[in-house]
Every structure is written in structure tokens, then in C-alpha cells.
Amino acid sequence: MAQLEADYPGIRFVYVTGHLDGTGAAENLNLRNQQIRDYCAANNKTLFDFADIESYDPNGISNYMVLKADDHCDYDSNGDGSSDANWAANWVAANPSQELTILASTICSDCCAHSQPLNCALKGRAAWWL
């Protein structure tokens, strides 16, 4: 990336973390994602943090990554090692009149590959700010 940035000084490059894969906090994916975050922070780089978006519902209260969430928003709610809940589906069901629910159930309802429409709406909103 450094060579590309040197070759194209007028271009803003966007770094991206890897999507969640259900391995949790102590595993390789999260460790590599943290390296990307640290590098971007230390070097004033633009970061599109897929993993962070996939880790939190819109309320931002629980970190589902530590509960072994994956990019489909499934996670282990009771610590038995099995994905048995879906934070995006739960949030949408609990917030039927929220703007994000309406967006997820209309515009994003059938165009979100291997994930939940809410997750895609959150990523789209983040991309808008880039």
C-alpha cells in the first residue's frame, strides 16, 4: 500500500478491516484487524472498519464480536460455542419504526449478500460518510 500511495499521491486510499468470521476476540482475524486499526490511527489513514460495524447493533451497547459474531450477524448468546442468535434480526424486531429498520426492510431487503439487510444498511451509511 505504501508504494501505491507513493505512486499516486493525489489519491486517498481507504483501508478496510476483514469481516467477522465467528472466531472471536483472541483469534487471528481480530488481531489482524486491530493491527490495521492501529496502523491507520498512527499514520492518519482512512479506515472503513467492516469488523466494527459488524460488531455492534445501532444502539452500540453490546460488542457481538467477543460473542463470536460473524458477518451474517449470528452470534453465541449463551457461551455454549454455537451461534444461536442474530443481533441484526433481534434489533429490527425490537425497533420496527426506526429509520434503519425501514431502510433495511425496503431498500436493502433483497440485495444484501451473505448478511442481514440491517448490516448492509449500516455499511452503506458508513460508506456515505467516507
Q: Where are the regions a protein language model picked out?
A:
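A general structural signal for short secondary-structure junctions and capping/turn motifs
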Residues: 5, 38-39, 119-122
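Histidine-centered active-site loop/cap adjacent to the catalytic His
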Residues: 47, 68-130
